[in-house]
Design a protein with these regions (language model features):
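Conserved NAD(P)H cofactor-binding loop of Rossmann-fold oxidoreductase domains
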Residues: 89-94
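SDR active-site lid
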Residues: 174-234
């Protein structure tokens, strides 16, 4: 992922995406950074260029717009960019009773977390297959294995990413493209996330990670060709233990734990 090749990262202006950009630049990877046109992406580009000798291109767009991914793809073709890494990080989520969250918001989650990711893989896979070795990293969640009450659509969307990634990896196993899926637990990416962590008390601090930790572990796992990457040893253990519980018991425990969202 060095030389004149580029790694493309979506949702790169803040949080985990920004951390992936920094971790990639530190390894000498040239970057194509994609995010909403809110001005923050230029700051990320400036910071990277001040620290590392890499090329950084930016593309601002709302990826949920019908032709947005095609516009991004056309940009890369026009620039004749060689891409050997795709990190599908862009995503959104919300918590609350399903019936209390607007249908528009629920569908926005599916649009960005699922439809955009599928479009990105479909458009850019032919470019990745031109390389001797290339990587796709899809951002799922630990919640893909732990369907959470009061986060029904979000956890459903992340379960799709998880299953899609494993299936696509198997389809592509005889070629140059390796697909990995990263399943982080709670990550503090903004003030709202910090408030949520505090609402859960001391238990949350055991599993919560910072964006740079997730990005570093995710990138290492990707480059090693790992299938499933679960940042944080405690989170890894929790996922394994959860499989030992009967589904009914597990769901009751999760409902109690996440009941704090039920008033939203």
């Amino acid at each position: 992922m060095k030389g004149e090749n580029f790694t493309l990262i979506t949702g790169a202006s803040m949080g985990i995406g920004r951390a992936f950009a920094m971790a990639s630049a530190a390894r000498g990877f040239n970057l194509i950074l994609v995010a909403l046109p809110d001005g923050q992406l230029a700051e990320v580009q400036t910071e990277i260029l001040s620290k590392w000798k890499v090329k950084v291109l930016t593309f601002t767009v709302d990826l949920t717009q019908e032709d947005a991914v095609k516009a991004l793809f056309d940009f890369c073709i026009e620039k004749q960019l060689s891409i050997d890494g795709l990190i599908n990080n862009a995503g959104i989520g919300t918590g609350g009773r399903f019936e209390n969250i607007s249908l528009e918001k629920q569908l926005q989650i599916i649009d960005l977390n699922n439809k955009v990711l599928v479009r990105m893989c479909h458009y850019f896979l032919p470019l990745l297959k031109l390389q001797e070795k290339a990587y796709i990293l899809n951002m799922s969640s630990m919640e893909a294995n732990l369907p959470l009450p009061y986060k029904a659509v979000y956890t459903g969307s992340k379960n799709f990413v998880y299953a899609f990634s494993l299936a696509l990896r198997e389809e592509l196993k005889s070629g140059p493209v390796t697909v990995s899926v990263v399943c982080p637990g709670p990550v503090v990416t903004n003030a709202e996330g910090l408030q949520r962590m505090k609402a859960h008390g001391s238990r949350a601090k055991l599993v919560v990670l910072m964006p740079d930790e997730v990005a570093e572990i995710g990138l290492k796992g990707l480059l090693k060709g790992k299938t499933i990457i679960i940042p944080g040893k405690i989170n890894w253990v929790l996922v394994k233990l959860s499989r030992l519980f009967p589904t009914t018991t597990k769901m009751r425990l999760l409902e109690r734990l996440f009941r704090v969202y039920s008033t939203h």
